[in-house]
Amino acid sequence: MTRYVFITGGVVSSLGKGLASAALAALLQARGYRVRLRKLDPYLNVDPGTMSPTQHGEVFVTDDGAETDLDLGHYERFTGLPASRADNVTTGRIYLDIITKERRGDYLGATIQVIPHVTNAIKAFVLDGNDDYDFVLVEIGGTVGDIEGLPFFEAIRQIGQERPRGSVCYLHLTLLPYIPSAGELKTKPTQHSVKELRSIGIQPDILLCRCDRPIPQDERRKLGLFCNVRESAVIEARDVDTIYAVPLSYREAGLDREILAHFQMEPETEPKLDRWQNILERVRNPEGEVTIAIVGKYTGLKDAYKSLTEALTHGGIANNVRVNLEWIEAEVFEREDPAPFLEGLHGILVPGGFGQRGAEGKIRAARYARERNIPYFGICFGMQMAVIEAARSLAGIEGANSTEFGATAEPVVGLLTEWMRGNELERRAAESDLGGTMRLGAYKATLGADTKIAQMYGGTEISERHRHRYEVNMAYRACLEAKGLRFSGTSPDGLLPETVEHEGHPWFIGVQFHPELKSRPFEPHPLFKGFIAAAIDQSRLV
């Protein structure tokens, strides 16, 4: 029998439901159980693909091309299990599907209502395709009391009534704030949050309480009494110094044991957490450190680069060093000399982005790295800007630019209008909608056998995830390669450039894909592993 754990949040947003879900999944997985993670997002966007990264954070792209919530990145990194478009749904997607069916006449003239039609669609999503799993963990985005979330809470309430007795658990993540003047953790916000949850028919079975200090026994007893949960089900979720300590912290607090006790399951084995302990040891006790500059467009919200920062951490774990990050807004380099900002740093990374704002700053960062032999890693937009820099500075193409920024006589980067997905030809036009129309998901690439990037991968055939609408123009390949910028990887048909590298430079690599999306703490991506290794070499020269 498949068992369902619904993870809700209260008191404040951004408590870390995604991390809590991923950590619990890792603990259950370490006990030998088969686990699936899913996310319900109450916003009206069909997906986060057109949302501003400074509001919502990064868009996490799956192998099958879904643009999803960044929490799915946590799920993948903590469990190693690839997510798919079937693991994330929004209110917008639910409503779009229902309205499409209504227009088609599928409801045979019925009046379409939130209950039962919307709630039934949510339930169908949650319950579909779970027969092969022991546990399905479902995170509900937002906070209890948000009006947008009401249909989702009603749907999971109904699932609790309709599933066999003992097959559903409601876990509520909440906050116990510490008031210095009172000298104590306050339980009242949690009590009110649970009251709100109970008012819509859901009684939490477990309270996972975020706090910055131990919960006194009296406060546990009070929470158990007023929230109607067992005292043992009041679980402490202490703040930790790194997210990779969360599974071990939850294990120590007894979260996985309480989950099994709720389902009346006898633990078959103790969780095997050696690899988590090894990772934590490397994170907390590095043998050195390097500093990497991230020259980006959305540096005001670090979650806009969540997978990127984690992949850099993984590269540090692989090389047993701490990776310090220097965040630099790309627009700064459009009005100031990059040298004072980049001097003494050990590597420069220019990540993906969209639009003209900050583009010239990224180009100047690429030039600084090339001229001073500093390790450079350009991802997606960062690769495109590096190619434009080479076209202008090395090939003498003064007007080199991207058509993304407007009409240009030298379209070194242009709109991608046709590409192969497997055996099928996909097409896009300039007037296409923005949502869901990019080159999305996993695509294969072929690398040159004698290239630096092939050495890092350990082979010439790779598959990586993409999210882009523009592409480097292959018409400029010959003149750029003549100046030392090698097109070191292409699509299997040879039509689309996938990677470039400067010959003669210690480490200057650009990739059109997003390697950060496939990096794991236990399997650091080879490019991030190589980039940090190059940064270590650079640190010895500074």
Swiss-Prot record:
> Is Nucleotide-binding there in the keyword field?
yes
> Quick one: which residues bind Mg(2+)?
71, 139
Molecular function via GO:
ATP binding; CTP synthase activity; glutaminase activity; identical protein binding; metal ion binding
- A GO BP entry: 'de novo' CTP biosynthetic process
Known catalysed reaction(s)?
A: UTP + L-glutamine + ATP + H2O = CTP + L-glutamate + ADP + phosphate + 2 H(+); L-glutamine + H2O = L-glutamate + NH4(+); UTP + NH4(+) + ATP = CTP + ADP + phosphate + 2 H(+)
Explain what switches its activity on or off, per the activity regulation comment.
Allosterically activated by GTP, when glutamine is the substrate; GTP has no effect on the reaction when ammonia is the substrate. The allosteric effector GTP functions by stabilizing the protein conformation that binds the tetrahedral intermediate(s) formed during glutamine hydrolysis. Inhibited by the product CTP, via allosteric rather than competitive inhibition.
- State where L-glutamine binds: 353, 381-384, 404, 469
Q: Which residues bind UTP?
A: 13, 186-191, 222
Task: Tell me which UniProt keywords the record has, alphabetically.
Answer: ATP-binding, Glutamine amidotransferase, Ligase, Magnesium, Metal-binding, Nucleotide-binding, Pyrimidine biosynthesis
Q: Which residues are involved in binding CTP?
A: 13, 146-148, 186-191, 222
Pull one GO CC term from this UniProt entry.
Answer: cytosol
Query: Which EC number(s) are documented for this chain?
Result: 6.3.4.2
Under which pathway is this protein filed?
Pyrimidine metabolism; CTP biosynthesis via de novo pathway; CTP from UDP: step 2/2
HAMAP family, per the entry? PyrG
Q: Which family does it belong to?
A: Belongs to the CTP synthase family.
**What name does the UniProt record give this protein?**
CTP synthase
